């Protein structure tokens, strides 16, 4: 199924300078390419993929050096800090946070097209950036919006029927992942592979599957929400709306804040976070076996559903509400510190704080905080989150084993709750819809670059003991 309308317009690339600040606050300039062609697929075919294929060949032939040492701590510590993945769209800096094709979140907010001046970036614009490395024009974004609106309904009836076979009480992520699996019957990659497509062309049906999947996951997610919480009364998509606004609309939220600001912001900042996190890595790993994007993304969703990954945004709001129930909304910072210690001493974590890579407060948190300060400064739960942030930084940041930096989950639940999406068990589904943009972008590049099957080596405890004796 062809997802985007072909528009044979390609013109010269132009570039413009976008100012960036690095960790030391000195100024540097990044050349951000833009283009006026409206066909995203043509952009990839005619220039970007051949260029990046040649670049990878050069790296393979010319650069044989080592990029780091593997320690026992890395092997026993979940491979944390071990460099071992090529990830095209993003880089996660421990101090600056995520960069989408070199652009920080504040920079994306400035240069990516919005629905109206001063609004949050349209997710379609981020998708163009992730796939091409170029900042799109509003016309290019509109072409993607139109493509999403024109996406067919193949397999949606199968998806609805499959989800309905589950108990309505099943966890939202169980229903969401099941629905995505049901969409797999329309896979263009599977059909092409069975017909013997040459491996150099693998990326083409992967592109079709990925774009159709991105278009359809909000339909799956909205169906799950309306089935669970609104008596199955579904709302059809509005083809005049963009990706984020349409998703909010199908959920049942019509406020401009939910459309214009919160959902677009949410989808953008949750789209990806480098390749080593559980969901992104799982999608890449499964796809390396030439599983199609539907199978790969469904696997990624199952990883996202874990409490140490995407389920954390659900756990944050539940934990905050437990604080209110036990201590009241007007809890002091000292009382809150005691409650944090109570949680930690019981062998649990405080959800929303600490990260495997990040070493400071980063834009994914601060942009949500700024949004809350502008739109809901008096909300009791937001004020409690603010106190919690201060408690971690003022009282707890000097503890050797504690990583106090807030992550993206620390704020999102409070914002969603304020605007009426109060069902915390559903929050990870929102995360999953967002993650489709980043994971599918990478899957297209995985196949375009011909990346191999992932197959690391494992060792036994005896092997490790012998290695330690030799050291």
From Swiss-Prot:
Tissue: Ubiquitous.
Alphabetized PANTHER family for the sequence: CITRATE SYNTHASE, CITRATE SYNTHASE, MITOCHONDRIAL
Signal sequence interval, chain numbering: none
Subunit note: Homodimer.
Disulfide bond entries: none
Similarity section: Belongs to the citrate synthase family.
E.C. number(s) listed in UniProt: 2.3.3.16
Catalytic activity: oxaloacetate + acetyl-CoA + H2O = citrate + CoA + H(+)
Compartment annotation: Mitochondrion matrix
Note: Citrate synthase is found in nearly all cells capable of oxidative metabolism.
Enzyme category, top tier: transferase
Record has RNA-binding as a keyword: no
Pathway(s) per entry: Carbohydrate metabolism; tricarboxylic acid cycle; isocitrate from oxaloacetate: step 1/2
Protein name stated in the entry: Citrate synthase, mitochondrial
Gene Ontology biological process terms in this record: carbohydrate metabolic process; citrate metabolic process; tricarboxylic acid cycle
Active site per database record: 309, 355, 409
Gene Ontology annotations for the cellular component aspect, listed alphabetically: mitochondrial matrix
